[in-house]
Each structure stands twice: as C-alpha cells, then as structure tokens.
Amino acid sequence: MDGDTICLRHETDDDRTVFITQVTDGKFSFSGETSSVTLCHIWTKKNPQNTVSFFLEPARITVELSLTPERNRVSGTTINNTWQQLNDSIQLLGQEVVRTSLLPMADSTTQMLRVKTIDSLHRKMSDCILNTARHNSDNPIGQYIKKNYKAPEFK
C-alpha cells in the first residue's frame, strides 16, 4: 500500500473527500482537532470499495486498512472498540449466511431448514445491532444506530 493515497470523509459531507494523506512505510496518519464525535469513512484511492467506518473523536484512533475488508480494524477509544465489536459480530454472522446459502442444492426439507437457518442468522444480526444501540443509547453509536437503522419486519 506504500505510495497509495488514503482518503477520509465525514459521513455528513455528501461523499466529498475531506482529507487525504499518503501511505509511507505501511503507515498513514491524520491529525487535527475536533470537538464532536462524527462517523467517518476512510479508503484508499486504489481500492475505494474497501472502506472502513469509524467514529472520529478527540482521541488517538487506530485504523488498520487491509487489502481485504474483513481484515480492516478500528480501535483506540471505547466508542470505536464497541463499533469494531459490532462489525466483527455482523461479519461473522454474514459469513455464516453466505456459507449456508452456497451449500449444494438438497431435498426440499433440507432446503427449508437452510432457509430457517439463514432467517435465524438475519435475526441475530438485527439483534446485535439493536442490542448495541440499546447498550449505547447515551453515546454516538447508539444515537447513530437509532437514527439510521430500521429493523427488518421478520415474518
């Protein structure tokens, strides 16, 4: 990733890049001051689909931007550690959904069991998100989820 350009934007900036920096010796950094907590997105110009979301706040935040999204990490503050835990949970459940959906076709009873398994995994994902919001209702994660997440209407 050396020499690649790292882009950062606040979620509220309508897809405008706010800051850019270069990767040198496998590392990059941004510095500045902020008085509020804002959800931000960071990506490389060479691979803009590989985006990491994190909460920018007055603290030192570590973002590990890997070549593959599942290895991306964010840490360094209570809010970002919680955000990473939520993302890890959703990612694990999502991988299980994909694994289950890619199993070879089987008889109708087995297929119905797989559909129920996938439905159960989707419910667990929703529960993870809603529980994170509930446990963090007094901070930006809970407020962000409450504002932006609509729980599915499971049947």
Task: Place the predicted regions along the sequence by residue.
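Amphipathic alpha-helical repeat scaffolds of TPR domains
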Residues: D138-P152
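A non-transmembrane, solvent-exposed segment enriched in polar/low-complexity residues
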Residues: M1-T132
